[in-house]
A protein has these predicted regions:
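Solvent-exposed alpha-helical segments within well-ordered globular domains of core cellular machineries
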Residues: 18, 22, 34-38, 72, ...
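Short, charge-rich, low-complexity interaction segments located
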Residues: 36, 45-52
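Alpha-helix boundary/capping and short turn/kink residues
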Residues: 26-29, 108
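Short Lys/Arg-rich basic patches
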Residues: 1-11, 24
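Conserved, well-folded catalytic cores of nucleic-acid-processing
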Residues: 42-47, 77-80
Length: 136
């Protein structure tokens, strides 16, 4: 059963509201309500992540696949964190560079540990971690 929408008022300084309207317009929002709801959800996900609650997300890394020691180290790290890895996708960006997208679900601290271990490997050119709600 879906929650019933509840209307409430928000008071803001004029300058802050103008900045907010500019921001949500650039982000493609049609109305303030959806933008505010998304910002609230984003903060809740951040709070869950920081407190070690269950999150889902993706770790992305770019590396040179010709450097075998990098590939082997990345695989070892992934196997060491198998309990939180849902899947991994390997993409050939060009002749030298590969993109790995690793889908994860687990405690925020474990997800952060995996992301930190992967990005610290010498030869990883770029790494990002994106987290969202696990749906619960």
């Amino acid at each position: 059963m879906k929650d019933k929408l509840v209307r409430f008022g928000v008071s803001l300084e004029g300058g802050l509201l103008r900045k907010f309207d500019s921001y949500i317009g650039a982000e493609g929002y049609d109305n303030r309500s959806k933008a505010i709801a998304d910002l609230i959800r984003k903060e809740f996900v951040s709070d869950v992540f920081e407190k070690g609650g269950t999150v889902a997300g993706a770790v992305t890394i770019v590396y040179d696949h010709h450097k075998r020691e990098v590939v082997n180290k990345l695989l070892d790290i992934q196997h060491d964190h198998g309990g939180i890895i849902i899947s991994a996708q390997h993409v050939h960006l060009d002749h030298d560079n590969c993109l790995e997208i690793i889908a994860v679900r687990g405690a925020g601290a474990k997800v952060r540990s995996l992301a930190d271990a992967l990005k610290s490997v010498k030869g990883v050119k770029h790494s990002t971690l994106s987290v969202t709600t696990s749906g619960k």
